[in-house]
Amino acid sequence: MALTKIFLILLLSLLGLYSETVKSQNCDCAPNLCCSQFGYCGTTADYCGSTCQSGPCRVGGPPTGAGLVGNIVTQIFFNNIINQAGNGCAGKSFYTRDSFINATNTFPSFANTVTRREIATMFAHFTYETGHFCYIEEINGASRVMCDQNNRQYPCAPAKSYHGRGPLLLSWNFNYGACGQSLGLDLLRQPELVSSNPVVAFRTALWFWMKSVRPVLNQGFGATIRAISGFDCDGRNLGGVNARIGYYRDYCGQLGLDPGANITC
């Protein structure tokens, strides 16, 4: 009789464990958590590693597009872009994949949740703004001081220019000021840091991206054009808009994605 009771207890325990395992495999993790092979949510390698089912999976996860940024922006992907810049381009010896990866490491909320579509979108804009990473700052930018003297929160420093610099051409004193404040850099007094340090350059682009572009990603590529360069939309610069779309389609193809809907503005 005692053996029968022990057997029943063990059987019920196993059934309970099985039930809990099945329940856990119905993974409904938060967007920032990975679903492990056993259906549990977490952020460590046990959850986001090679057996990850869904979420921001890392190496070897399912082909959902989510994963560490370095696994999406490979050296080949980066080289395919920058190699199209001419040999005389200043950016060709300035921008590197490593500097981009290092910059993303300072934005963990980006690096740990980025998708292939977001990379295709981002690098389409990088390509357009910099001419395949040819330009570090906007053409003839030094002739455009771009100082809003009415902005008292971020006053312009004497003899400094706030023309477009970096992969997304950070411009105007109020953007340099807010960006520098966020990054812990005095970009109001040293705006040239953006064009002399490639990691800083990419960090400024990521700052603008997280603030103004990522919030509209789910609206389609067209919404990101409007967020970055709204004055090009509504037929005002069809050539520029179509060029951005062309790069986006190209990178979607390289990353195995359909461009999706709402790609123009």
Swiss-Prot record:
Glycans are attached at residues 102, 262. Disulfide bonds join 27-35, 29-41, 34-48, 52-57. Residues 67-265 are annotated as: Catalytic. Its EC number is 3.2.1.14. Keywords: Carbohydrate metabolism, Chitin degradation, Chitin-binding, Disulfide bond, Glycoprotein, Glycosidase, Hydrolase, Plant defense, Polysaccharide degradation, Signal. It catalyses: Random endo-hydrolysis of N-acetyl-beta-D-glucosaminide (1->4)-beta-linkages in chitin and chitodextrins. This is Endochitinase At2g43580.
